[in-house]
Amino acid sequence: MKNLALSSMQPKPGHFYAVGIGPGSPDLLTLRAASLVENCDTVISPQAKGSAKSIALEAVRPFLKDQEVIVHNYPMQRNRAKTQQRWQELADDVARRCDAGESVVQVTLGDPLIFATSSYLMQGLSEKLPAGHIHVVPGISAFQTTASRFGEALTLQEDRLMLMSATDISAVEQALEQCETLVLYKAGGCIEQLMELLRRRDLLQSASLVSCGEQGEHELQLADLSQWRVEPLGYMTTMIIRIGSRPWLEE
């Protein structure tokens, strides 16, 4: 999708807004995100399968008025055909609402364009809504939240920053050779394999992680993975590995 419309503070009838709401704390929404949630007709929020509540919905609850609120269990399976079919059904519903003149906001944790459900929904809407009726509002991402916990720069001067999913360990090992700072999303489900890789590469002390950042008592921080003790980690676990730094380019 190209040439998306610029978004304003006030939602327009018949328009769709993919709104990043940050890591899950209401005070980390941008002013634009809060205003769109507060003034739209319909709010759509994701909820992980098996979860008792939607983290994204709880984060925007202080800004809700009398909008219709829809909570969806979005498809997270690896069956491409079934996943695409479900996203198409969701896109059809949003398109019907927009055709009826509703302003629709889909809230998503983090940023709508980084490992986010919004990206799938926007793909389905791209041929259903008129040009200029799809908007993206950026949000604070998980890797920014994780970095803020430890106060160390992610990249300086010529350093290369790479962001990827942690689920393919062989790809992670290759990435360690291609950047100075590596950010891994979805690290909780493969933490033991990651620990073994980092141990073998002597990088445990150079790696840190945050699980469930900005989610109150559920948050776990670890500044040095050599101190990690085996315990379950959530899906929303982000790891930062600082591999080194590149020499400055002198004039």
Segments predicted by a language model, with ranges:
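Class I SAM-dependent methyltransferase SAM-binding "motif I" and its flanking Rossmann-like core
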Residues: 114-178, 229-230, 243-247
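General beta-strand structural signal in soluble alpha/beta enzymes
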Residues: 45, 71, 106-108, 136-139, ...
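Conserved Motif II region of HX4D acyltransferases
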Residues: 98-121
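Glycine-rich, flexible N-terminal cofactor/catalytic loop recognition
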Residues: 4-72, 176-178, 196, 208-209, ...
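A contiguous loop/helix-start segment that scaffolds small-molecule binding in enzyme catalytic cores
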Residues: 16, 176-251
